[in-house]
Amino acid sequence: MSKPSYKVADISLAEWGRKAIIIAENEMPGLMACRKKYGPSKPLKGARITGCLHMTVQTAVLIETLVELGAQVQWSSCNIFSTQDNAAAAIAATGVPVYAWKGETDEEYMWCIEQTLVFPDGQPLNMILDDGGDLTNLVHEKFPQYLKNIKGLSEETTTGVHNLYKMFKEGRLGVPAINVNDSVTKSKFDNLYGCRESLIDGIKRATDVMIAGKVCCVAGYGDVGKGCAQALKGFGGRVIVTEVDPINALQAAMEGYEVTTMEEASKEASIFVTTTGCRDIITSVHLQQMPDDAIVCNIGHFDIEIDVDWLNANAKEKVNVKPQVDRYTMQSGKHIILLAEGRLVNLGCAHGHPSFVMSNSFTNQVLAQIELWTKSDKYAVGVHVLPKILDEEVASLHLEKLGVKLTKLTEKQATYLGVSQTGPFKPDHYRY
């Protein structure tokens, strides 16, 4: 069955998208270094990479890097609200099949992913680049005939990695996978520093709210939660954290945050951010006892953290204030302001993480794709991480842009520490 060569909101936005991509390239030194280092040898030649990851300007730079390295690429977004339509148009205009636009329905979302499985020459995908696991699950559950040709997959985010480990434990994973999320240069940078900037961007664009002085509740204190708590505190918010893990709870307490339950926090906070990657974090009980016009949003991957279905079924009225901002009137007469329908607020209400930090993450993705494509015999079916030396290389590629001058170990110092002068400098279990 024939398919459209692309489907985006408006192809005439391509010129605008190209201007944004050019600016982003200058902020993404890791990806540009990959082009310079690997472009001539085309290590991804023959790879047919199907990607399902937020179709943003930064992702456009990733896609063009994969193409420069020899791959054929097809793309969809991993969230119905996260596409930047100018970026999607710019990539589609280059001939790369893109199926993504901001504001897809759930049915359109799955249709878009399905369009990327078979390439224009009739050949199916042989590599997966995923964010969240929807593409991975679709291939395993609905199109298992393609698994035999797939050399591997790389997964971007915490939620998708949880899915991979669960699949492997249950014997359902059919291909080797690289967990990009747990590269230090991804999780300790994208998850923390990226969210520290993009959360506030999303909340401010959506609501224009003054954060200073307000009580803010952050559900979860992993890397994402840490970044969100820092951001809200930095703007003068009085931050409460909720946690299930005693280690994370202790970390939050020793950073000076109040740590309590959502049952208690929901009575007091004016701004709520869920960051957990788990379901049922803010329930009907919590929503009903929030202060009037409480702002509720999520920065975890899926829309299962806030009980949006209950809100839609039980609120007296729902008013759409503007795209991705809804104000609910509760039975009590109080109001709840929900952002991005409970989906990723930083991408639904803003443009996601800045280019520089995404260069960290996406350089890991490129290296993971090269590893799996060129060294497939090295990787058995299972979930793997990139070697520490590559993690350090990713960090090194981003130092010059920030004016960082790295100290070099002397031979005597290296011998004393028992490491090479060129790394890796830390054991795999080091937590940073």
UniProtKB/Swiss-Prot annotation:
Disruption phenotype: RNAi-mediated knockdown results in increased S-adenosyl-homocysteine levels and reduced lifespan. It is an enzyme of class 3 (hydrolase). It comes from Drosophila melanogaster. HAMAP family: AdoHcyase (MF_00563). Pfam families: AdoHcyase, AdoHcyase_NAD. One of its GO terms (cellular component) is cytosol. Its cofactor is NAD(+). This is Adenosylhomocysteinase. It comes from the Eukaryota. The lineage of its organism: Eukaryota, Metazoa, Ecdysozoa, Arthropoda, Hexapoda. Pathway: Amino-acid biosynthesis; L-homocysteine biosynthesis; L-homocysteine from S-adenosyl-L-homocysteine: step 1/1. The gene is Ahcy.
